[in-house]
Amino acid sequence: MAHTNPVKVLEHCKISPPPGSLGNKILPLTFFDIFWLPPYPHVKALFFSEYSYSMHHFKNTIFPNLKHSLSLTLRHFYPLSGHLVWSQELSEPEFCYIDGDSVSLTLAESDGDFHHLSGNHARDVNQFHCLVPTLTPSSMVDPEFSIPLLALQVTVFPNSGICIGVTASHVALDARTLVHFMKAWASVSESGVDSLPLDSAIP
């Protein structure tokens, strides 16, 4: 049986946009969004990068910056912090962000072979399942129909590399939007401040 590369979860956290920066917001769906309503499968993606330091160094130096920069980035992508909701009072579903809504961020550690997983060759897809997070319901909004839109997982392969796993609802995010979001997060993380506007700051 193929090795499934189990991971050790070290931390679960909830990351929100900066408090009071947005207020409550409602965003209606467009005609083109309707096609992607659940039960359509989630978008899942993995981003690999080499990292030649220890888990201790990452957790104490890099991860706090990732959390802070993610919070700043979510201010510009606030629907991803919210939910897709559809209650009896609504004639159609909509994106709903309530101040304090958050994205799930998981920190994990793996003893798997980073270079094998990130290499340009055929691999067993089962080895990747543990690197992407799951989307779990939240009780912050009406439970009749409330779906979180984004979850993130950072898996560290000590002295080898890191993998950022993304699970997102396709109704809120396609591949192009995901790449735009990841570039924005990387830009804020590198600069240490919210230096966007996004359209001009991201290559």
Could you describe each region identified by the protein language model?
Residues 1-203:
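Non-catalytic N-terminal regions of enzymes
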